[in-house]
């Protein structure tokens, strides 16, 4: 299989890339890793007349957290859209600041695909089963988009409109992903997180995925929680309702079971040749329970924050 003929440009700056997008509009596609776009072009599912290579733009390569945080702020961790998934996976600052993303990245394809794929590319591609997109929604990340008119922001939870469809305009480029940090835990509390999924084969797109991040007090009561499900809806789903349900409760088997049952009531999956709707509901219940248990265990073995 071969793609249709196209023109190729490699802008030296982000401003040049935005100018090219403004000129060519829907006829142009950005390429950084090409992990998703190139196969689609080979199958002629995507037929861009122009391919704009942004893989070497330094403006898109940042991994940054504030050196000092005010007492009343959780802070923000900024990841450039062009950062390779393998770089993010190995970066010590990223692993310490965004442990949930570090766990999710292990499930993304294979080592070879993570060596090419970028954080921003996965988010913009819009696959409902994408691990990175799910974590961005669960952690309530903010996406910075840029065009010739300047920068704008959109919440990750509002970015996805339908399968493979996002709110980004043809002339816009995703530049940064801003993750709110859980940086100021209460005295004596601990935090934990987990990501899990089920697929037909290792490295395949998930039939259903789930993730959770929790903060527990010394007695095991939940102080804060975020939960999400992927692959069981037209969009990656953050479920703040589940977090609210867990806050104040002791995170024991009963509370986890109630949350897992509630998760099923919040989704309406569709069946396909890979899995029926009922099977996806079953997987959602199992995976939500599993990630909450694993996150609880992770928190229980973490070092408590001193009062």
What are these regions (language model features)?
Residues 1-307:
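C-terminal structural segment of proteins
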């Amino acid at each position: 299989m071969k793609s249709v003929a196209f023109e190729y440009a490699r802008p030296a700056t982000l401003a040049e890339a935005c100018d090219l997008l403004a000129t060519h509009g829907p006829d142009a596609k950005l390429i950084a890793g090409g992990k998703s776009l190139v196969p689609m072009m080979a199958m002629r599912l995507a037929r861009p007349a122009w391919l704009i290579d942004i893989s070497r733009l330094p403006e898109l390569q940042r991994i940054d957290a504030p050196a000092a945080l005010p007492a009343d702020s959780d802070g923000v961790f900024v990841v450039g859209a062009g950062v390779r998934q393998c770089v993010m996976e190995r970066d010590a600052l990223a692993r310490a600041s965004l442990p949930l993303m570090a766990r999710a990245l292990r499930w993304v394809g294979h080592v070879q695909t993570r060596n090419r794929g970028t954080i921003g590319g996965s988010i913009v591609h819009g696959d409902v089963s994408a691990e990175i997109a799910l974590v961005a929604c669960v952690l309530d990340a903010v996406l910075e988009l840029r065009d010739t008119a300047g920068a704008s922001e959109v919440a990750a939870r509002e970015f996805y409109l339908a399968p493979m469809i996002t709110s980004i305009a043809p002339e816009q480029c995703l530049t940064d992903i801003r993750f709110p940090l859980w940086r100021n835990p209460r005295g004596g509390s601990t935090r934990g997180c987990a990501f899990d999924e089920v697929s037909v084969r290792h490295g395949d797109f998930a039939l259903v995925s789930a993730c959770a991040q929790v903060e527990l007090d010394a007695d095991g009561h939940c102080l804060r929680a975020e939960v999400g499900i992927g692959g069981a809806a037209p969009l990656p789903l953050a479920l703040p309702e589940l977090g609210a349900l867990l806050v104040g409760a002791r995170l024991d088997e009963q509370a986890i079971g109630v949350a897992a049952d509630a998760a099923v009531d919040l989704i309406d999956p569709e069946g396909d040749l890979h899995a029926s709707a009922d099977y996806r509901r079953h997987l959602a219940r199992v995976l939500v329970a599993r990630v909450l248990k694993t996150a609880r265990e992770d928190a229980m073995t973490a070092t408590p924050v001193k009062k």
